[in-house]
């Protein structure tokens, strides 16, 4: 019964209004308020501040600065295995596997469309059909910056409007097409192994998503927006393996997609595996 009520609430709640209100609180600079909020959050979720560049909780100008905190140099060493594909973020593997019949496995009999995930453009999604995907869920205590699994040249960024369902095991098992329904930012790259997509998926109370090249990516009008970054227009924008790609102001999920015969995921990783940014996610197929 509790689960049914929770899922019902997900459909009834004003997702964007709640998220924007919480976003305003997260940017509050009133000293006593932001300090209490940060201290409560760090204690509640057992955040490890020993690896943060700034360990003093009161030194952050607002909650979002704390939430998107930088780590000390060396806190996330990058796997140096030849051909390594790096994990883009701290968190847990939600699912990983093959993109079969144009769909990605979600949970418990649910799947979602790769074409819809990438903004509804079949041509954009075509290079990934029959390829591989990995979904990484970032919990509240995790480091919330997302990094490049491989070096790449940015080709296109797509803002896709949508709902802001909470992202957790319960919603994954009960909300059809969850990741293809939530607001998201699609980042498409060319790499030495072919096309790569990194999708930053929003969720309830995720006030915004940022990328290192565009800053805040939440257009005032909630309509799909595509921006190309080829050499003739805005580019090229090149990011090294392990470089920061973007960040969540209150977290959610990162999904990585590759084309067919590009990568093989690490055998020890399965749904539920805890991961850290920079560790081995998979290997390039030579």
Swiss-Prot record:
InterPro entries: PS_Dcarbxylase, PSD-B, PSD_type1_pro. One of its GO terms (molecular function) is phosphatidylserine decarboxylase activity. Pathway: Phospholipid metabolism; phosphatidylethanolamine biosynthesis; phosphatidylethanolamine from CDP-diacylglycerol: step 2/2. Its cofactor is pyruvate. The record marks 251-252 as: Cleavage (non-hydrolytic). It comes from the Bacteria. The active site is at 90 (charge relay system), 147 (charge relay system), 252 (charge relay system), 252 (schiff-base intermediate with substrate). It holds the Pfam family PS_Dcarbxylase. Keywords: Cell membrane, Decarboxylase, Lipid biosynthesis, Lipid metabolism, Lyase, Membrane, Phospholipid biosynthesis, Phospholipid metabolism, Pyruvate, Zymogen. GO terms for cellular component: plasma membrane. HAMAP family: PS_decarb_PSD_B_type1 (MF_00662). NCBIfam families: PS_decarb. This is Phosphatidylserine decarboxylase proenzyme. The gene is psd.
